Amino acid sequence: SNLDIDVTKTTTLSMNIAGNVNNASKPYTGLGSAGMLINMYYSTPFSSPGLVDGKLVNASTDYPDLRMPFTGGSGMGYYGGGFMRTSNNTLNADVQLKQKLDFITKGLSFHIKGSYNSGFTSYTQASASVATYTPVLQEDGTIAYKKYGQNSQLKYEDKDPAKSRDWYMEAALNYAREFGNHHVSALLLYNQSKIYYPSAYSDIPRGMVGIVGRATYDWKNRYMAEFNIGYNGSENYAPGKRFGTFPAGSFGWIVSEEKFWKPIKSVVSFLKFRYTIGLVGNDSFDGNKQRFLYMSDPYVVNNSSLINRDGHGFLFGINNSTVSPAAYENGKNNQDITWEKALKTNLGVDANFLNDRLRTSFDYYHEKRTDIMLSDGTAPSVLGFTPPLANLGEMRSWGWEITLKWNDQIGDNFRYNVGLNLMYNQNRVVERKEAPQNEEYMYQKGRRLGSRSQYKFFEYYNSETTPAHYKEVYGTDMPEQLVSDLKNGDCVYVDLNNDGKIDSNDMSRQFGFTDDPEYMAGLNMGFSWKGFDVSMQWTAAWNVSRSISSVFRQPFTDRTNSDQGGLLEYMLNHTWTPENPNPNAEYPRATFINDTNNYAESTLWEKDAKYLRLKNLQIAYNFNLPFMKKLKLNTMQLALSGYNLLTFTPYFWSDPESKASNSPSYPLTKTYSLSLKLGF
């Protein structure tokens, strides 16, 4: 609920309260929210026929003919395993008081604001097991079932509830006033926040405090300037380094407001140049999983390991000596760590043409990040400990964005619009403090963040043609591969350092793209005609790739690499085989023996994840009926909407837009909705 109260002519009180309660129930799989789907990925068609006469039937390798070396996973692995129920309750509330202070000076005002959010999630889960049955063929041709295990009662398990709570408050003085053609404004704001139950040291809340100042000026809405400064404090740093100062400034010039622009204003109706530069700070690292890294080094006693005599302690006596507990250094801290910083600049141009029917915008940005927290990989191992985090990293990012929007009308009833935006993003790691490597191409420094270390795939091995082909391309003999007994259809990799063998020194970060697209585009189109409204949105991305996980690349292998996984249909249809030795097959020869060679990290498994997607489509009709006036009904709209309707992509393993699509995850769903909107 939202409530706005005019307490006096100069005082306004606003309150907003929202809450949510939801309950969910799902089978207990032990594999997370997508457990049922993951079971399907890991299953094989010969692992289980499912339920037969109420019995869960599983195949077995224990047959006289020994024709089944393994059965693989079962798509019914979750059956009878129990359940998990969650109950989630959230509360969000905020209140704001605004007070005009014109009696002090015109344009001065004051406001205070506070918000409070809390959440509580309880879990009820119980596990169980059911008897399984294995079919056994009898001499007379009938099938008997051998029983394994017993049906067990549900066993309820304890799981701690999840809690969340935070509050935020601010107090600010605002000033805005016009002096003829001069417009000025200023802001002075204090804010403070606290987050309870953080992931690290959950008993100690996280706290932030800051002061913000802002001043703006414009003359005739033609020349504009703004200056901001932030002074923020974080608990993550030692006294003396806890607070950081972060200034920013922006400038703008609307050229089309100048007198000399009038002759061409009918063509270029609006033109604005703008420039922004600012320094921002970041105090979170490692997903906020680490805190207080400036404090004294922590020590730990590992008593459980001492029982087995493999922990840290002192031995007294001979043979069956007594272990006396002792502490060991759990990590090294650094009192000199401070804020990560980013200097951001943006240069932009806005231009409208043909009486604002065509609106365009162009932005170029550059960001230089310094003092990035990381551990020094160049430190020698003789130190005997992992170096502490320090402000050692540096990175650059840059790119541009173009936006085009066209709005027009044909006749009295038909209006249409088209909008296109295109973005380019690039970055480079300037300093990473990586461990020394034998080859330059092994470093992430100088390359895009997220570049992959992988072998360069050459071709599938053919004993008659590959050695000669390799020598023709690279001028040297084909190197020794990761396995000595190479078979036709196995992967052949390129010897990047020309030492005659393939090893970790041939893994390079210079190939392919990353999980983040370099180019992204969007297209919005729509029209309205005699009560009908039609709109659609297309999105696209390219110069992006995914390195598919072992479940997607290696048949019969699950996430534990126990060789008990699934055989997916596209593996069967796109694998090199002696019967179909396709040199362009997606998959090499299926093998367990040479799996370390064929399924190693390489460019073969880096798949193009570009896509074009119809994100949403809506067809609506706006009614204008006589009875609406009697009911004081201003609008009545019936709309049919669709979401994620079409996707065109060469990446068929999962949703190409998701970074998690390189491994089994919940699939993308199409959504259709029918809505009726009433306005009074």
Please provide the spans of the model-predicted regions.
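Small-side-chain secondary-structure face that scaffolds active or pore-lining regions
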Residues: 1, 18, 26-28, 86-92, ...
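Flexible loop and strand-edge segments within Gram-negative outer membrane beta-barrel domains
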Residues: 1-71, 84-89, 121-123, 162-165, ...
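Outer-membrane beta-barrel transmembrane strands
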Residues: 1-7, 16-18, 66-126, 156-178, ...
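Short loop/turn motifs that connect adjacent beta-strands in outer-membrane beta-barrel proteins
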Residues: 10, 28, 100-110, 123-125, ...
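Transmembrane beta-strands of outer-membrane beta-barrel pores
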Residues: 19-23, 92, 114-122, 190-198, ...
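Conserved small-residue
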Residues: 29, 289-307, 390, 407-513, ...
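Extracytoplasmic gating/loop element in the C-terminal half of outer-membrane beta-barrel translocons
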Residues: 76-77, 541-638, 642
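Solvent-exposed loop/turn elements at secondary-structure boundaries
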Residues: 262-341, 352, 357-395, 433, ...
